[in-house]
Amino acid sequence: MKKTFVLLLALGMSLPLLASCERRIKIEQLPQPAREFISNYFNDTEISRIEREKDHGRNEYTVRFKDRAKIEFDENGRWKSIENHSTPIPADALPQRIREYVNNHHTGANVREIERDDRGFEVKLTNGTELQFDLAYNFIKYD
């Protein structure tokens, strides 16, 4: 009886782990907007792997490149985060107003990482500066 209880307890505790599992996929399995984004801004960068993660019933995608760049997409193919610690993120991949703010206020710095959530954007520059923008791309503050 004790063994059965322990087994059921272990099984019950492992279910959340099963709900969030990663699986390798091919580029053709990405949502169309994600494929277009990669084609437009990272076409010259070789992909090392693509993963789909099911998290709370929603698909999320992570694309890793051989130059150590990484892009995370939501279930609709909209980017959630872009990062590259070996080379700057292509300027054209960034929202125009964020790109202009960085160019005007941080001459010589490039964007190394950008994250989008339901409140706005967090941007990390190559000079170590961290910036926050709202959803309308207005600068809010330095982090």
Regions found by a protein language model. Name each.
Residues 1-26, 38:
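Bacterial Sec-dependent N-terminal signal peptides
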